[in-house]
């Protein structure tokens, strides 16, 4: 596994629509800082921004999740490009590897299975689900808020 200074992760999902630019974004920086932003203008909701530092054990678990997913072996060339429905971005620096993925929003596994690269997109889909679950848990526990 890479040392903490060789690790960075950023995820973004969003779209511009009826309620403006709505998005969810989070990042883990090498020093353990977790930055979280959730912007929904639905019913004049306000943007939620939170920052917290996580323990090195959380960073190690994050790296383990990424390693286990084998996302670094994937390529987004055949994935659906961002469209009017929205876009997703995932950027990871782990050790000497720097990978970045961009695709459209994925509604369900049906979208994954109908893509040109269902195996690769499935890896991305499940990794994103795991990352969102971890981040929502960390934010919810730390700040006692409902992140969705």
UniProtKB/Swiss-Prot annotation:
Task: List cellular component terms (GO).
Answer: catalytic step 2 spliceosome; cytosol; exon-exon junction complex; exon-exon junction subcomplex mago-y14; neuronal cell body; nucleoplasm; nucleus; U2-type catalytic step 1 spliceosome
Under InterPro entries, the record lists:
Mago_nashi, Mago_nashi_sf
Impact upon substituting residue 119 to K: In a breast cancer sample; somatic mutation
Where does this protein reside within or beyond the cell?
Nucleus
User: What family does the entry list?
Assistant: Belongs to the mago nashi family.
Q: How does it assemble?
A: Component of the pre-catalytic, catalytic and post-catalytic spliceosome complexes. Heterodimer with RBM8A. Core component of the mRNA splicing-dependent exon junction complex (EJC); the core complex contains CASC3, EIF4A3, MAGOH or MAGOHB, and RBM8A.
Name by which UniProt lists this protein: Protein mago nashi homolog 2
Taxonomic lineage is: Eukaryota, Metazoa, Chordata, Craniata, Vertebrata
């Amino acid at each position: 596994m890479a040392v903490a200074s060789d690790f960075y992760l950023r995820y973004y999902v969003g779209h511009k629509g009826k309620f403006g630019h709505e998005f969810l974004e989070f990042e883990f920086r090498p020093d353990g800082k977790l930055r979280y932003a959730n912007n929904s203008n639905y019913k004049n909701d306000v943007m939620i921004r939170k920052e917290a530092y996580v323990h090195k054990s959380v960073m190690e678990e994050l790296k383990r999740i990424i390693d286990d997913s084998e996302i670094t072996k994937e390529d987004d060339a055949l994935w659906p490009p961002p469209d009017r429905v929205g876009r997703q971005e995932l950027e990871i620096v782990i050790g000497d590897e720097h990978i970045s993925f961009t695709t459209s929003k994925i509604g369900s596994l049906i979208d994954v299975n109908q893509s040109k690269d269902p195996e690769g997109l499935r890896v991305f889909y499940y990794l994103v689900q795991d990352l969102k679950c971890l981040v929502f848990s960390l934010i919810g526990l730390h700040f006692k808020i409902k992140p969705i």
